[in-house]
């Protein structure tokens, strides 16, 4: 019987006999004495086997990396000069008396302590990958976060209620994963993109405070922070306004960070959406980076420089500057790389001015400003740019000029890139936790492709008080009772006050060009139940995967999920998704127009 975990044996167990079980992390033969580092989920302990115990010595001699062993022995101090203060077990070792080989192991595809393994190799051999200490730590922290959330919400009076995994398809922005019904041929369930409607119905049912930690599914193009199946900390409350909900969930975030990382997050400032977009080009600004946009659209309306003037005069156009302290030292190569980078976001180029001498702001050859564009701008404009940005000698000013969406995304991404690469050494990046709330989101945004307004969050978000009439008369300026929790440039949670009156919900659907017939067909069960005395209610959902990714400092969300999918939505461990046989398809009344092999060949 195991008496101790390997990584938890300390000096308090000196001279005691212990039994540990685990994997051979490393084996060394030192002139007739064998050393084995035995590993389990709690860490590593050093085991010494000498020839005086011949059976144990023979077992140790046959063992190789990743063999599974049971070892019984006496705990003793390590010899002087061989201790490791970074480990709980670093001052002791076990002198083995008995060793049992519980299982042999094939040679693993990579060493457990090898940090230079490609992600494809890791995901194909995920079980071995999960033995690595960093992965063990990540998933243990994930567990701690989930348990901390449960403890906090339980104490706040929330009830854990499960909602269905098989439900109806309702449009929420991304494509649904569909599940064909065998019992109802030609009909489909959908895996939920969120428990949104069910949690609202639980409020109508009178449960007052609900939560669950649940899987959600979205069939969308994947990025570093997205998975087709992801875990959501979902909650909903009745009779609370947005300030009260934000206070509760802010308290939860603070408690979780304190318990898991011993970090005090402090208070969360609140920033209107319009301010976030104006100064940072993003609704999830990374406040560790002290760089802001400077608005120049008005100034460029009277300039002759076509690139800036064209954007300033364009409907929905924008011209901004981004001052980077000490950036004049950027090389031509670095600026070219930044130009390519903003091109990813649709920018056609990246204009810049290096500030060498603020005392000479002419646009002539002797100008204190260095740039190909200086000669195209008036001296008045140059002086105004320097004044507005507060630029000093040695700075560089980057410019964005295009549709506001392109400018915001391109220069916003540049702000992050420059800030992370150069901010620490130049004083405009602080490596700390910077949370905030972004509030006062627009209710709708215009979808040029669909030629109509769509919901920014989802169509069940309530309009800001006094904005109900704007939903139809001026949807572009209608604000929502929505709020996002942002941490270091990541949206880790988003929520809103919901619509609790059927007539208001019908007006929102109408503003989104959803006909009464379509409303009833897709959302009739919601509209019908809102008529039975639905309480005012609202909530929030946290992305558990994103939150843990931030807390661990992992490079990818895939590093905090036990068995994730690739960016092509595949599981390399099990080779899912996979083809199914014709019999299974016939049972589901399905016939494929194109076989999987044909699709891959095409």
Curated annotation (Swiss-Prot):
Amino acids binding L-aspartate: 172, 218, 457, 498
GO CC annotation terms, alphabetical: cytoplasm
Subcellular location, record wording: Cytoplasm
Reaction catalysis annotation: tRNA(Asx) + L-aspartate + ATP = L-aspartyl-tRNA(Asx) + AMP + diphosphate
GO molecular-function term, one example from the UniProt record: aspartate-tRNA(Asn) ligase activity
Database matches in Pfam families: GAD, tRNA-synt_2, tRNA_anti-codon
Binding site for ATP: 218-220, 227, 491, 543-546
GO BP of this protein: aspartyl-tRNA aminoacylation
HAMAP family, sorted: Asp_tRNA_synth_type1
Family recorded in the similarity comment: Belongs to the class-II aminoacyl-tRNA synthetase family. Type 1 subfamily.
Assembly and binders: Homodimer.
Name of the molecule in the record: Aspartate--tRNA(Asp/Asn) ligase
Organism: Neisseria meningitidis serogroup C / serotype 2a (strain ATCC 700532 / DSM 15464 / FAM18)
Gene designation per UniProt: aspS
């Amino acid at each position: 019987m195991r008496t101790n975990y390997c990584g938890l044996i300390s000096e308090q167990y000196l001279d005691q006999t212990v039994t540990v079980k685990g994997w051979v992390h490393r084996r060394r033969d030192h002139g007739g004495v064998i050393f084995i580092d035995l590993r389990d989920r709690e860490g590593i302990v050093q085991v010494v086997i000498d020839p005086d115990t011949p059976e144990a010595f023979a077992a140790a001699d046959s063992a190789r990396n990743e063999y599974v062993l049971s070892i019984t022995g006496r705990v003793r101090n390590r010899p002087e000069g061989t201790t490791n203060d970074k480990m709980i077990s670093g001052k002791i070792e076990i002198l083995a008396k008995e060793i049992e080989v519980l299982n042999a192991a094939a040679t693993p595809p990579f060493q457990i302590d090898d940090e230079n393994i490609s992600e494809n190799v890791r995901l194909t051999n995920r079980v071995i990958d999960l033995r690595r200490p960093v992965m063990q730590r990540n998933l243990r922290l994930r567990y701690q976060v989930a348990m901390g959330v449960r403890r906090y919400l339980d104490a706040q009076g929330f009830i854990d209620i499960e909602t269905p995994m098989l439900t109806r398809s309702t449009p929420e922005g991304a494509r649904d994963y569909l599940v064909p019904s065998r019992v109802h041929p030609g009909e489909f369930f959908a895996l939920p993109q969120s428990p949104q409607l069910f949690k609202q119905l639980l409020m109508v049912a009178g449960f007052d405070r609900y939560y669950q930690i649940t899987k959600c599914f979205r069939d969308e193009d994947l990025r570093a922070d997205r998975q087709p199946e992801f875990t959501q900390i979902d909650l909903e409350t009745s009779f609370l306004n947005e300030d009260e909900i934000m206070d509760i969930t802010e308290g939860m975030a603070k408690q979780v960070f304190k318990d898991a990382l011993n970090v005090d997050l402090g208070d969360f400032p609140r920033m209107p959406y319009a301010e976030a977009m104006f100064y940072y080009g993003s609704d999830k600004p990374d406040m560790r980076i002290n760089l802001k946009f400077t608005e120049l659209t008005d100034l460029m309306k009277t300039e002759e420089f076509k690139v800036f003037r064209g954007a300033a005069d364009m409907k929905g156009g924008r011209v901004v500057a981004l001052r980077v302290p000490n950036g004049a030292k950027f090389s031509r190569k670095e600026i070219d790389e930044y130009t390519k980078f903003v091109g990813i976001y649709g920018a056609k180029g990246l204009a810049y001015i290096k500030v060498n001498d603020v005392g000479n702001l002419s646009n002539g050859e002797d100008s204190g400003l260095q740039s190909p564009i200086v000669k195209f701008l008036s001296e008045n404009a140059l002086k105004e740019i320097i004044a507005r940005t507060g630029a000093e000698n040695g700075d560089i000013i980057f410019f964005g000029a295009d549709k506001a969406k392109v400018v915001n995304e391109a220069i916003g991404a540049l702000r992050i890139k420059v800030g992370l690469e150069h901010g620490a050494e130049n004083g405009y990046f602080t490596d700390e936790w910077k949370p905030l709330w972004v509030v006062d989101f627009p209710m709708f945004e215009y979808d040029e492709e669909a030629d109509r307004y769509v919901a920014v969050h989802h169509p069940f978000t309530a309009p800001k008080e006094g904005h109900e009439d704007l939903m139809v008369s001026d949807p572009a300026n209608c604000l929502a009772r929505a709020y996002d929790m942002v941490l270091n440039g990541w949206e880790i949670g988003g929520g809103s006050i919901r619509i609790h009156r059927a007539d208001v919900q019908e007006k929102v659907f109408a503003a989104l060009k959803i006909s009464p017939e379509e409303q009833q067909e897709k959302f009739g069960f919601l509209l019908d139940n809102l008529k039975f005395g639905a309480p005012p209610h609202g909530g929030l959902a946290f992305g558990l995967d994103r939150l843990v990714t931030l807390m661990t400092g992992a490079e990818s969300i895939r590093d905090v999920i036990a068995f994730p999918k690739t960016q092509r939505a595949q599981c390399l461990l099990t080779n899912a998704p996979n083809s199914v046989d014709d019999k299974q398809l016939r049972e589901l009344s399905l016939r494929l127009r194109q076989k999987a092999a044909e699709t891959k060949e095409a």
